[in-house]
Amino acid sequence: MNGAELKQKLMAKAKEIGIDKIGFTTADPFIELRERLKESQDKGYASGFEEPDIEKRVRPEHSLPEAKSIIAIALAYPSKLKNPPRSEPGAYRGIFCRASWGEDYHHVLREKLTLLAAYLQELVPKARTQVMVDTGALSDRAVAERAGIGWSGKNTSIITEEFGSWVYLGEMITDVYLPPDTPATDGCGDCTICIDACPTGAIVQAGQLNAQACIAYLTQTKGFLAEAYRTKLGNRLYGCDTCQTVCPKNRKIHFDHQAAFQPDPEKVKPLLKPLLHMSNREFKEKYGQMSGSWRGKKPIQRNAIIALGHFKDQTAIPDLIELLMNDPRPVIRGTAAWALGRIGGQAAEEALRQAKGKEQAEEVLREIDKALDMAHAG
Ligand code: B12
Ligand code: SF4
Ligand code: SF4
């Protein structure tokens, strides 16, 4: 069977196993990406979550010797919640980004790619394959762009004609030759809506992100969140969708045919207060299947505290005092102090003063002092 015939068969199989979009490219090095990754590292824009070895990232043969082709796939995920529960005074809610709705996409895409790889091996028994989703060495976006899945938007997301940017990406490298597709071309034109809408100015120029300033990244950090960003976080518990929700290419785009990505509204828009006292076990049981739980419960709890401060939720004061006084984690005590300072009031101020008398950790004491100033000024 020649490459073109193989490709046709793979495309038909992909459809059968529920892959929404498939594209093909060569395993040639990603030359342009090399410069971009280098610049991102040099300027301190990288998140640190990506593979640090640039050569591994741009040369597919580092992942699979004698690589010849890459098969890129995309799966669409929903952008809207049916009957979303509403935040109400005293019962405020946080939000997980859409890429964390439903089952963890890593498993779902990997499973489909593994089925596709098995099929290729049926057709070409000597074929070798390497499957990747997010955590692999390659840039999933650079692969998708070159394989014609979608163009690289100014917000850095891959945007497909059919599903907008609400797609997960993954790929399979193989040593089998498959004719490449045409790379996607820019569809943003003069638009700059995402750049203007980004709350932290993290899109430093069209297509280039300073991940260190991106809320999606900041929600995943484990330490204290720099003060300047706390008020920008809003009620985000994990990730940030702003530069995608504002994008005109996503207007009216909502695909919920992938059963695995159906969100449970109570999980993706949970009440904030119950999150504060969750045990590790409860957290794992409730959120363990979501991709947004990969950093554990601490960042989510820290962000929940910030969200309560953002809403100035008076009814959260007793919970926040409890954390300030008794939580063993300095980041949680210090962030609770910040939230109490923001909410203000006599009970908050008194608790902060009391905590100041017994707190040992320098960084928490600094937060308490600032919070007392804030409570006083407010
Ligand atoms: C590290 C990482 C992050 C970091 C950094 C993101 C970033 N933009 O670099 C953080 C934590 C911030 C993040 C956030 C998100 N991520 Co993320 N992330 C990754 C990861 C693991 C590596 C990305 C990377 O290498 N970045 C470094 C840059 C330099 O590389 P790159 O983005 O791949 O480069 C492309 C473009 O950015 C562009 N580019 C880069 N530099 C420059 C410079 C110029 C001048 C120009 C014009 C273009 C350009 O060229 C490349 C080809 O398209 C990938 C998975 C993977 N292995 O690739 C997922 C991935 C990119 N993330 C994904 C998702 C869904 C998200 C979020 C939407 C989740 C959320 N809702 O919070 C946000 C989006 C934030 C944003 N504006 O990008 C999806 C993207 C799907 C899509 N449709 O594009 C991926 C592909 C995971 C997956 N397999 O589905 N992510
Ligand atoms: S994900 Fe949020 S913070 Fe990051 S670039 Fe987009 S709008 Fe800005
Ligand atoms: S908002 Fe505009 S510039 Fe940004 S990604 Fe969408 S189309 Fe491109």
Residue ranges of predicted features:
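Alpha-helix N-cap/helix-start positions at coil->helix boundaries
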Residues: 294, 298-299, 314, 328-331, ...
